[in-house]
Amino acid sequence: MDSMANTVSSSVVNTGNKPSETLNKTVKNYTPKVPYMCVIA
């Protein structure tokens, strides 16, 4: 879980235009049952 959260955070940090859109794509790439989607988004 920690490594996944770090990857998601890195994706958001590296994206300056639409971080929320990138976050949604990143979360969906991992699994549709990720609780972080509700916590971060």
UniProtKB/Swiss-Prot annotation:
Any one GO CC term of the record: extracellular region
Lipid attachment, kind S-farnesyl cysteine: C38
Protein's cellular compartments: Secreted
Residue ranges, annotated region (Disordered): 1-25
Keyword Phosphoprotein found: no
GO molecular function: mating pheromone activity
Propeptide: 1-29, 39-41
Domain of life: Eukaryota
A single BP term in Gene Ontology: cell-cell signaling
Gene name for this UniProt entry: mfm3
Primary localisation category: secreted
Function per UniProt: M-factor is a mating pheromone produced by M-type mating cells. All three mfm genes contribute to the production of M-factor.
Swiss-Prot/TrEMBL keywords: Lipoprotein, Methylation, Pheromone, Prenylation, Secreted, Stress response
Record's protein name: M-factor
Induction (UniProt): By nitrogen starvation. It is further induced by a pheromone signal. Its transcription is limited to M cells.
One Pfam family here: M-factor
In-chain residues carrying the UniProt-annotated modification Cysteine methyl ester: C38
